[in-house]
């Protein structure tokens, strides 16, 4: 089974459990509203209510936070944009139909931000650290995320992780999905460049640089799975195997869902 198929199955699995638990919560609340004299175990009812409150409070917090931070950082990046370089870069990659913003900052910054209209943000430090070919490899990696709407997909995955983090299947699924997405973005950049040399130089230099400052509400070039990404560079002819380790979390999550179904109908 290819990594792309595995990634899609894992994502579908996350969404399935999220929707299933939400449906059970809805049924339970409907049952509660129709019958105030529930015959079930009182402590289970209280616990179920607490789980519902916790879940939806976390989801709402994430939605508000994402909306606020996304707007905040877009305004911040626009206010610090290097007008001339931004204009040149947008003209150079005009066929991408994607807005690029070059921020005046000596530090390394390369990310994709925005869900409805994703944008690529890079710092002037990127142009100081890397040559033209290496910069293009970085931009191609970010463009992959833009053209595949990965910000929306990762936001949904993060929403599931925040709201349904108590399901054992969610956290490893999000981690696996994010890792494969980064590998696919790297592979796309390599294919477009025709060589792994330029992207490899970027990754190795970033490893030497150490920790990179990150921003919320964005997909970052350096954020995930650097060891797997370097392995893909070193062995481009081989498919990088990312362990899933989802069998036990899947069984535990199924047990939790079954418990909710039994308790909700009692």
Where are these regions (language model features)?
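Post-HEXXH active-site segment of zinc metalloproteases
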Residues: 150-174, 178
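Active-site scaffold of zinc-dependent metalloenzymes
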Residues: 106-132
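Hydrophobic alpha-helical transmembrane segments
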Residues: 1-5, 89-97, 102-104, 183-206
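Active-site recognition of the HExxH zinc-binding catalytic motif
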Residues: 122, 133-154, 158, 185-186
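Short amphipathic alpha-helical coupling elements at transmembrane boundaries
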Residues: 137-140, 144, 187-191, 205, ...
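Cytosolic-facing loops and C-terminal tails of multi-pass membrane proteins
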Residues: 218-266
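Hydrophobic or amphipathic, alpha-helical segments that drive membrane association/targeting
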Residues: 1-102, 240-243, 258-266
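Short helix/loop segments within enzyme catalytic domains
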Residues: 81, 172-228
